[in-house]
Curated annotation (Swiss-Prot):
<feature type="compositionally biased region" description="Pro residues">
    <location>
        <begin position="118"/>
        <end position="130"/>
    </location>
</feature>
<protein>
    <recommendedName>
        <fullName>UBA-like domain-containing protein 2</fullName>
    </recommendedName>
</protein>
<feature type="region of interest" description="Disordered">
    <location>
        <begin position="118"/>
        <end position="172"/>
    </location>
</feature>
<dbReference type="InterPro" id="IPR054109">
    <property type="entry name" value="UBA_8"/>
</dbReference>
<dbReference type="InterPro" id="IPR039310">
    <property type="entry name" value="UBALD1/2"/>
</dbReference>
<feature type="compositionally biased region" description="Basic residues">
    <location>
        <begin position="135"/>
        <end position="145"/>
    </location>
</feature>
<comment type="similarity">
    <text>Belongs to the UBALD family.</text>
</comment>
<dbReference type="Pfam" id="PF22566">
    <property type="entry name" value="UBA_8"/>
</dbReference>
<dbReference type="InterPro" id="IPR009060">
    <property type="entry name" value="UBA-like_sf"/>
</dbReference>
Length: 172
């Protein structure tokens, strides 16, 4: 039973090494065996090997790590298509695609999201609601008035949230 358990443990370590380093399974097995199945030692030797210029032909490059995007020109193209002006629209592109939804999912939230106070708190600054000035700051009223936002925006704060949420759930 212990032999099977060791084999299983070695296979799990190989798989974990492949996921961590982004190399092939046979290379991971060789490095782990050379390091006497010490994961950190094998990982350290893998990345030290990557820094030696003479090993570039033999080295297996990482596949999909944050430092190396899957396809760099495509990533640049996607970033160049993102426009800040697309976010408030919330519509679908003319071709029927969902590029506006994707750009909203990748962009920061709408400006009113950052400017408005939390819904359960009274805003610090209240604009006068009537020209005669009947309302004062100590007059706390909890009616269903929308909280003021600065800078003023033409789109309501609840508008673009639904497409963003549906776009995010659709990508999973």
């Amino acid at each position: 039973m212990s032999v099977n358990m060791d084999e299983l443990r070695h296979q799990v370590m190989i798989n974990q090494f492949v996921l961590t380093a982004g190399c092939a399974a046979d290379q991971a097995k060789q490095l782990l065996q050379a390091a006497h199945w010490q994961f950190e030692t094998a990982l350290s030797s893998f990345f030290q090997e990557a820094n030696i210029p003479s090993h570039h032909q033999m080295m297996c490059t990482p596949r999909n790590t944050p430092a190396t995007p899957p396809n760099f020109p495509d990533a640049i193209t996607m970033f160049s298509k993102l426009r800040a002006s697309e976010c408030p629209g919330g519509g679908v592109s003319a071709g029927g695609g969902s590029s506006a939804q994707v750009s909203m999912a990748c962009s920061p939230p709408h400006a009113s999201f950052w400017a408005s106070p939390p819904p359960n708190q009274q805003p610090v600054w209240l604009p006068p609601s009537s020209p005669t000035g009947h309302h004062t700051l100590h007059h706390h009223h909890h009616h269903m008035h929308p909280p003021p936002s600065w800078p003023p925006v033409s789109q309501p704060a609840n508008g673009p949230q639904t497409p963003v949420i549906s776009a995010l759930h659709g990508q999973r």
